[in-house]
Amino acid sequence: MSVIRIVPEPRPLLDQVFRLGESPIWDDRRERLFFVDIDAGEIHHVTAEGSSHRMWIAPPPDRPTALGLTSAGRLVVALTRSVVFLDPDTGAWDALAEIDVGLSTTRLNDGKVGPDGAFWVGSMDERPVDEREPVGALFRVTPDGRVEKKLDGLVVANGLAWSPDGRTMWLADSRGPWIDRFDFDPATGEMSNRSRFATPDEEMGRPDGCTCDSGGFYWSAGVSAGRLNRFAPDGRLIEHWDLPVAWPTMPCFGGEGLRSLFVTSLARPGVAAPARATVPAGTLITLPAQISGLPPHRFPDPRG
């Protein structure tokens, strides 16, 4: 089966360049897209049309790396080495859990709320690429603040997603590079039957952040190739979407009917972008999708 190449016509959502845009998540109650700029220490939200832009700054020297939504309307936020709550209405921060990531050069990275109601977050070696080692791990944080290490031996944990029925989990290592599949029990949070799902290379697009659509297809940001890769549930690459922005970091579905894609990207000052990149690197873009996404799971909030 041949791979379909799609050249979409996205538009920038904001007239702003972000240093390391990541973790977009659509809040269906507020009808806002939340996302982070890790290196700037910022959390942002904006409407699907690009209006009502607001920003929150993480308590220095911490940096926000990943977001989830809670049942009470707060955000659950992965910082460098901890997980906290942020109330977007009041700006109040509340602690949830400290995470022992090991080395001082290791930090938390990609994270999401799973179908089990826990916040899952991976860690990464933040040293220069040629010095990185598999010191990262995958953690599960429960609403009462308990932390369980579920997996270790990762270089850059990334690409967390779950299937529509919650019984398949995906995890990527951006420096593996690989994407693995697990059987998942949404009642207990147990992972089993690990298998290799895909091995995207630099040309195909090193796997960064991801999302899953309503058909159970896995969308991976191919950060090194400037594209989105759409994989079938059996691991076959069926589409790749060439993007006009270099270095995309993570897609998510949102907007009306969850039929828009939002894609964050990173800026690399001093590095020339590919010739086809017509949008500045670090731009947040949006484009119509051919299929709907899945509503995000919500973290049970102690506030109710």
Locations of regions flagged by a protein language model:
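A short beta-strand motif characteristic of beta-propeller blades
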Residues: E9-D15, S51-A58, D94-V101, R146-D152, ...
